Amino acid sequence: MKKISRRSFLLAAGMSAALVLTACSSTSSSTASSTASSAASAASDAASASTQAIQSLEDLAGKTVGVQLGTTGDLLMSEEVGEGEDKLGIAGVEQYNKAADAVQALLTNKIDAVCIDDQVAKNFVAANPDELTTLDTAFAEESYAIAVSKDNPDLTEALNGAIAELKEDGTLDAILDKYIAKVEGATGYVSPEGTEYPNGTLVMATNATFDPYEYIENGEIVGIDAEFAKALCDKLGYDLHIEDMEFDSIIAAVNSGKADFGMAGMTVTPERQEQIDFTDTYCTAAQSIIVLK
């Protein structure tokens, strides 16, 4: 997927032309009924045509974009509302508690596009291949890290050491091969037989609606983050317990002590760094725009 800077794509092709609908009315009931039917059909066609016109980031001007509340997509799209030299000029942002809710709103023509992490976007498109696609240009690149309370620097340091080791020994690559590259026969990470947990249990806060990073399968939370967290905890001598919650509640849960760390495809941003510490990054992704075909 090609990636360009915000300024570069804002200097690219101009905005799409707007579609204008007009309808006539009649005093006869039969004509009124026919007119209403035609108007409804025309409105539906217009909505479809409007969405189909989104072929580039510039085409988002005047459109409504759906995001998951509190995510990087939410932060980025909120900055693009309105007019300005460095803005996309979108009409508004609709926030949803779950990414799937945003995609459903797109499928039912309630919004014009969805901004979400690229790997997550790929899974939604794969599940709806006849209806959805993504723009060829990624919106922004980002790096994921683990959120830890500023009051727990020892845990941050320990996790950083374990992250470095699991990158070096190929464990992280094995997990990514399973969930992203989808290498045939890739098994990801499985705790070695006889693994012990002398240091107790660490609680991880997540939002299990973010396939392939964390999602529920057969009643269990699985995915890149869940599996990598298990590998990290095994390395440090801790058992792992995962708590599922709204994404926007994760940082508060960690800071309050309800969870030891947060891991949910979480991007390191200056705003979040004011509230919480982050480990070294372990994965890089980009924001993608999902639209109707």
What spans do the regions from the language model cover?
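Acidic, polar ligand-binding/catalytic clefts
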Residues: 49-60, 129-139, 150, 230, ...
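Periplasmic-binding protein-like
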Residues: 118, 122, 126-160, 189, ...
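C-terminal motif of bacterial Sec signal peptides marking the signal peptidase cleavage site
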Residues: 19-23
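A ligand-binding cleft/hinge motif common to bilobed small-molecule-binding domains
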Residues: 75-81, 100, 105-140, 249-252, ...
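Ligand-binding clefts/hinges and TM-proximal coupling segments of bilobed small-molecule sensing domains
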Residues: 72-93, 134-135, 163-199
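Bacterial lipoprotein signal-peptidase II cleavage site
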Residues: 24-44
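Extended ligand-binding regions for polar small-molecule ligands
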Residues: 25, 40, 71, 122, ...
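Extracytoplasmic small-molecule ligand-binding "clamshell" domains
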Residues: 92-95, 197-266
